[in-house]
């Protein structure tokens, strides 16, 4: 039996977002999300999603995405398998406000450098989601790819933390330890023109992820995946992990924001129909952690918009 990570996460997130009776003083995810919509029912301001996987099996995926994009005022950094690079590049050319092309490559492929060069030539703006590596992310054999990304000034999205097992009846050369958030620190320091983005905030190594982001201006994380589902009843714990709001810092932050939470960006990593549900989970975390309104806007799109030079 095989199940994709996104299928698993979509099902668990949906279960977590079933209507329930709110406790006294507790704001539900739906209530939190509704507060930040304008009169049209769309989110107040552009949402930029770092973590939307192009589905090669859905012939109507672009059309389906555009409907969701219009409803949610959403721009997607569309994570694209190399085999679909031209399809998504063409779509991004037609719909530049909705689709920003990002390319998935296998870091262990013998022609990976040529693949990255081709993606750049097609107008891709970054790489991701890099995952299932045969060596730790900071292995020198991967440096030629990072050198190119550094030259291009790209965002590179790495899977971090635990990863779903897809095959149970045959061997897999997969290990979460190769994808720990601690490996991103060296990449960020060696290649300062890369914006290093870790998916899933290192789940379950949130504190390592947060501290690496704290001291490196070019490191951010998303909270996609199972974290906001499993932490549903204790979202305020993130305030302990992202603890340094208002403290003096040597590293720069987007717009000089002093909230520790500005080191997060929005990522959904789910089926199209569930993206608004993940938005609700983020807003519930904002409420539980008293994240300032200005910082919320940076997380939900402001930071990525500035990094990519997207028009307001």
Residue ranges of model-derived segments:
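Active-site gating loops and adjacent loop-to-helix segments of metal-dependent hydrolytic enzymes
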Residues: 38-44, 71, 96-98, 163-170, ...
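Short, acidic/polar
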Residues: 58-66, 109-119
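Active-site environment of divalent metal-dependent phosphoester hydrolases
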Residues: 55-58, 83-87, 108-111, 136, ...
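Divalent metal-dependent hydrolysis catalytic cores, especially in the metallo-beta-lactamase
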Residues: 47-52, 64-86, 99-104, 125-129
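A cross-domain feature marking catalytic cores of carbohydrate-active enzymes
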Residues: 50-54, 80-82, 103-107, 128-132, ...
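Catalytic pocket-lining loop regions of alpha/beta-barrel enzymes
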Residues: 28-31, 37, 126, 139-265
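Mid-to-C-terminal alpha-helical segments outside catalytic/metal-binding sites
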Residues: 2-50, 59, 63-76, 251-265, ...
